[in-house]
Amino acid sequence: MTESREPHVAGSAAPRPEPANGLASGQPSSRARYSRVLLKLGGEMFGGGQVGLDPDVVAQVARQIAEVVRGGVQVAVVIGGGNFFRGAQLQQRGMERTRSDYMGMLGTVMNSLALQDFLEKEGIVTRVQTAITMGQVAEPYLPLRAVRHLEKGRVVIFGAGMGLPYFSTDTTAAQRALEIGAEVVLMAKAVDGVFSADPRQYPEAELITAISHREVIDRGLRVADATAFSLCMDNGMPILVFNLLTNGNIARAVAGEKIGTLVTT
């Protein structure tokens, strides 16, 4: 399973009662600009820069998501698996690409289950749906069921990518957002947004606050893979690229505050 680099289950535990999430199954709070969002999380952030999971990072992300869910916003999530495996990189080391991509998909499921656990510790009922059937740990991906979960105030995490090799989790995020009727893809990164050049190599690079899908593709800006941007461009799906490492930024993104980079058609 591939996932672009940063720029520049139902679980086995006994079912828990539905929490009293305030507006979770009703209308979003007046502060929210969006009522249904698809949050794309890079797997590398879940590892805190290392291989594996950093529980402190996952817990912090879960708290941010729980905050917006309690405000009535419907949240679906796609997570990469880069903290465990990257199919393209394994291919470069001699592995067969299809097999290495499937290994990456399993990494996304591990991340999904971890986030589910921390969200439920926050009192947020969460379902994991996977594109590859694994009934003992997650539901199969069914878009209509996912929408029903969202309407009931549950978080839905989509694992195993598209279930197909050669497709990145960025592309999965775009496709799932369109299929569940999300209003925006919130693309969480480890940088403040889209820059004119890689800010780690070029300190003078400027943050771009607004740009079109077409310009991102034409300029070759490394935000997500071109397939994901083309899919969003063709279907008028906006993308907000923002820094996940700033606490509270998910709520700011949902509220429509001017953070990061807004990519529109």
Swiss-Prot record:
State any GO CC term: cytoplasm
Q: Which UniProt keywords apply?
A: ATP-binding, Cytoplasm, Kinase, Nucleotide-binding, Pyrimidine biosynthesis, Transferase
Top EC group = transferase
Question: What EC number(s) are associated with this protein in UniProt?
Answer: 2.7.4.22
Disulfide connectivity for this sequence is none
What's a GO biological-process term for it?
'de novo' CTP biosynthetic process
What SUPFAM superfamilies does UniProt report for this protein, alphabetically?
A: Carbamate kinase-like (SSF53633)
The residues that the entry says bind ATP are 40-43, 82, 86, 195, 198
Which family is it part of? Belongs to the UMP kinase family.
User: This protein is called what?
Assistant: Uridylate kinase
Q: Which organism is it from?
A: Mycobacterium avium (strain 104)
Q: What is the lineage of its organism?
A: Bacteria, Bacillati, Actinomycetota, Actinomycetes, Mycobacteriales
